[in-house]
């Protein structure tokens, strides 16, 4: 890690921590998913037929298996949406706030700044994953399920990995926000990614689609290979490079 990159990461980290948008997103992702998970699990426990029908195979589960399974299903879409919005915001706000021109005068290259932005959001994603997993544990223990056993811990670990990988899946939002010079293109791409993932999963072709792979693996690890999981990070790396390259080529008159 170069000195310039460390400096850029430190600056972007301070900006991210101070952002009301990021704070709100963190709260909505962690508390929102945990609350919805607890509500659906409680409704399923009462035998609500409509809820049980929506849960599919999870309808036959109970306790920790039901709770973690619901959390995984919700996180697969809601987590990706939240991370995509934050990724688009962190990268796109320089354009919407009109501060992008000032970056041309800094001694740190624009490519380094772009790389730092993506890196900071990915680290934040990992922090959110820890908080979300811990909150689900608290919900389970508080809900009378006792301490999780080995199988339950495995499910919680998959929830954590799914959340982290959802951040990687959201990296294209950074590139879209750069090309579109603002927040909205990044959000639009995120929504498109979620919608396309749903379509391909229904069509049975989601294993090699990076947006769907983490969720499919979290639900049933046997159906997803290591190569398919690794491809998620390859695609994230490609879009990170694309974002950095686009920032390097930015011009003041655009």
Where are these regions (language model features)?
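Aromatic- and glycine-rich beta-strand/loop motifs that create alpha-glucan
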Residues: 1-31, 178
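Helix-loop-helix units of permease transmembrane domains in multi-pass membrane transporters
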Residues: 88-122
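Transmembrane helix-loop junction
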Residues: 93, 106, 137-141, 145, ...
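Hydrophobic core positions of alpha-helical segments in small-molecule transporters
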Residues: 24-28, 116, 189
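Terminal transmembrane helical anchor/hairpin motif
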Residues: 2-3, 29, 39-68, 187-254
């Amino acid at each position: 890690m170069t000195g310039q990159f460390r400096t850029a990461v430190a600056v972007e980290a301070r900006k991210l921590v101070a952002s009301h948008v990021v704070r709100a997103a963190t709260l909505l992702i962690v508390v929102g998913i945990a609350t919805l998970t607890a509500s659906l699990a409680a409704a399923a426990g009462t035998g609500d037929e409509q809820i049980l029908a929506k849960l599919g195979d999870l309808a036959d589960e109970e306790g920790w298996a039901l709770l973690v399974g619901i959390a995984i299903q919700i996180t697969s879409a809601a987590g990706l949406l939240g991370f995509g919005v934050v990724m688009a915001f962190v990268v796109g706000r320089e354009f919407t706030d009109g501060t992008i021109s000032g970056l041309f005068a800094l001694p740190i290259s624009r490519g380094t700044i772009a790389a730092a932005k993506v890196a900071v959001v990915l680290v934040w994603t990992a922090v959110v994953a820890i908080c979300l997993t811990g909150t689900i544990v608290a919900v389970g223990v508080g809900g009378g399920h006792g301490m999780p056993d080995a199988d339950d811990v495995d499910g919680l670990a998959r929830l954590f990995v799914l959340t982290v990988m959802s951040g990687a899946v959201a990296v294209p939002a950074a590139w879209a926000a750069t090309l579109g010079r603002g927040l909205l293109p990044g959000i639009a791409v995120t929504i498109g990614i979620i919608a396309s993932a749903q379509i391909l999963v229904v069509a049975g072709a989601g294993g090699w689609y990076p947006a769907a792979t983490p969720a499919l693996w979290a639900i049933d690890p046997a159906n997803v290979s290591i190569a398919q999981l690794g491809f998620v990070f390859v695609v994230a790396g490609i879009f990170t490079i694309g974002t950095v390259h686009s920032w390097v080529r930015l011009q003041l008159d655009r």
